[in-house]
Every structure is written in structure tokens, then in C-alpha cells.
């Protein structure tokens, strides 16, 4: 076992979504350098569920692209469960259009970004953001995608 994926599709229309293999590949290219074995749940949701979760857990009154919920094992308990990613289909699709990015590249970026959050990376402080964005770019380019922050740098 390397990275075990539990994929939950909580959207009515599943046409056009990345495949389970796509999600698995993106996890496999992101997590093992930091943690060789892990279990990750990816839940694809609609904007209503994303909005509710974003409100409940972050105090933000809107849907968001990806939410990361790291698993915190009780003291003394060893588990490979890394955590959950909740990705909002509508937000990802809208952002890809607005940012003029290929849709699959943006899906991959959300998995990479969320996975790094599960691994403890953050982007609250400038130096943290720089480190995290650099890792995201390196991972994305390693999978054949362009720098996800290219438009912001130009």
C-alpha cells in the first residue's frame, strides 16, 4: 500500500469529472515524498455542501475550491489516515474558466494544494505561502502541468 484513496462523488452529474485513476495519480505524485503510506478521502461536492462546510469550519459565507481536514490520531495511536479533501466541482470549473487554465490542470492543482495542507503546509504567512507555492509548482510541473501560479507572476 502506498497511498490509498477513498473517492466519494457527492454530485448528481458525474460526467466530466476526473477519473478515480486521475485522483490516485495526483495523490501518488504528491504525498509519498513526505509520507510513504497514507489514506486520503477525496469528496467531490456541489456548491451547497461546500458553502455549508466553509461556513461551519472557516466562518466564510461562500463555497470554496478545496477544504482540507487533516486527521489527528489520538495519542499513542498509529494510523496511516492522513485526512479528507473536500473539493467543490462548480468552484473548480468556474476558477478554471476565470483563470484561463485547463480544467484537468486545475483539478490536479486542487488535489496537490489540499494534500500539502493535509501534510501540514500552509500559506497564511508570506514565507509559508512562498514555500507551499514552490512545492505546488514543482509537483505540478513534475506531472507535466504548467506552473499553477504563472498568471499571478506575470
UniProtKB/Swiss-Prot annotation:
<keyword id="KW-0698">rRNA processing</keyword>
<feature type="binding site">
    <location>
        <position position="113"/>
    </location>
    <ligand>
        <name>Zn(2+)</name>
    </ligand>
</feature>
<feature type="binding site">
    <location>
        <position position="123"/>
    </location>
    <ligand>
        <name>Zn(2+)</name>
    </ligand>
</feature>
<comment type="similarity">
    <text>Belongs to the endoribonuclease YbeY family.</text>
</comment>
<dbReference type="GO" id="GO:0006364">
    <property type="term" value="P:rRNA processing"/>
</dbReference>
<dbReference type="GO" id="GO:0008270">
    <property type="term" value="F:zinc ion binding"/>
</dbReference>
<dbReference type="Pfam" id="PF02130">
    <property type="entry name" value="YbeY"/>
</dbReference>
<dbReference type="InterPro" id="IPR002036">
    <property type="entry name" value="YbeY"/>
</dbReference>
<dbReference type="GO" id="GO:0004222">
    <property type="term" value="F:metalloendopeptidase activity"/>
</dbReference>
<keyword id="KW-0479">Metal-binding</keyword>
<keyword id="KW-0862">Zinc</keyword>
<dbReference type="InterPro" id="IPR023091">
    <property type="entry name" value="MetalPrtase_cat_dom_sf_prd"/>
</dbReference>
<keyword id="KW-0540">Nuclease</keyword>
<feature type="binding site">
    <location>
        <position position="117"/>
    </location>
    <ligand>
        <name>Zn(2+)</name>
    </ligand>
</feature>
<keyword id="KW-0255">Endonuclease</keyword>
<dbReference type="InterPro" id="IPR020549">
    <property type="entry name" value="YbeY_CS"/>
</dbReference>
<keyword id="KW-0690">Ribosome biogenesis</keyword>
<protein>
    <recommendedName>
        <fullName>Endoribonuclease YbeY</fullName>
        <ecNumber>3.1.-.-</ecNumber>
    </recommendedName>
</protein>
<keyword id="KW-0378">Hydrolase</keyword>
<comment type="function">
    <text>Single strand-specific metallo-endoribonuclease involved in late-stage 70S ribosome quality control and in maturation of the 3' terminus of the 16S rRNA.</text>
</comment>
<dbReference type="GO" id="GO:0005737">
    <property type="term" value="C:cytoplasm"/>
</dbReference>
<keyword id="KW-0963">Cytoplasm</keyword>
<dbReference type="GO" id="GO:0004521">
    <property type="term" value="F:RNA endonuclease activity"/>
</dbReference>
